[in-house]
């Protein structure tokens, strides 16, 4: 078996897309599952309510808090299950405080963390709507955990893979009728006026629907998968 290679195509604060070559389906699926359930992240585990006059049960608000994604520093934290403390400590957790009076809506950005580097990833997640005279005050403890324990510790929302496509155009059969270019739903193909031929311009965007193959009158185009590339 050839050596597996991983190439990052694009990456930002919200997503990463990469290409894996020299692997089979079982290995790529294992990598997908590891991304979902093995990578440690912070999530709120316990909530102590000091006051809650809102029209929402403590349990419901605690559940919402648990699903708020929190930025994580794996160099300074250890898994709660591997920590020597009895309950929680700065090595495995961080404390956040939520406090507010109505009328107003409290958002994830209102959670104040004792560590400015460990805070909600997004500030705009609505948590509770307070009416006039209602008040909420609580302390939440976020601990380092893994997705295999609970979904709130999953670092990804969607983690998927697809087979890598390979598109071959037979120049002898192709008459440049542009039928395949017009019918492709993802604009993978384009007509090169200088060379007077069809060319592939966005291969990775191909969903392998094979619409181009079906609509080509001369069967000049072929779409297939690369067995060891995803």
Question: Can you say where each PLM-predicted feature lies in the sequence?
Answer:
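Protein-protein interaction/assembly regions in multi-subunit complexes
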Residues: 1-230
């Amino acid at each position: 078996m050839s050596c597996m290679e991983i190439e990052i195509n694009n990456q930002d604060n919200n997503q990463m897309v990469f290409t894996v070559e020299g692997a089979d389906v079982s290995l790529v699926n294992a990598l997908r599952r590891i991304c979902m359930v093995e990578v440690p992240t912070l999530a709120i585990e316990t909530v102590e309510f000091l006051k809650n006059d809102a029209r929402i049960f403590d349990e419901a608000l605690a559940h919402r808090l648990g699903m708020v994604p929190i930025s994580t520093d794996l160099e300074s934290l250890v898994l709660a299950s591997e920590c020597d403390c009895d309950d929680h400590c700065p090595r495995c957790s961080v404390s956040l405080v939520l406090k507010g009076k109505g009328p107003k809506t409290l958002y994830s950005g209102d959670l104040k963390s004792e560590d400015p580097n460990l805070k909600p990833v997004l500030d705009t997640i609505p948590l509770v709507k307070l009416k006039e005279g209602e008040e909420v005050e609580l302390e939440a403890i976020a601990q380092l955990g893994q997705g295999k324990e609970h979904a709130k510790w999953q670092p990804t929302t969607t983690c998927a893979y697809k087979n890598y496509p390979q598109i071959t155009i037979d120049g002898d059969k192709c008459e440049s009728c542009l039928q395949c270019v017009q019918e492709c739903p993802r604009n993978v193909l384009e007509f090169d006026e200088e060379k007077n031929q069809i060319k592939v311009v966005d291969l990775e965007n191909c969903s392998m629907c094979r619409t181009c193959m079906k609509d080509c009158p001369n069967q000049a185009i072929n779409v297939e998968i690369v067995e060891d590339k995803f």
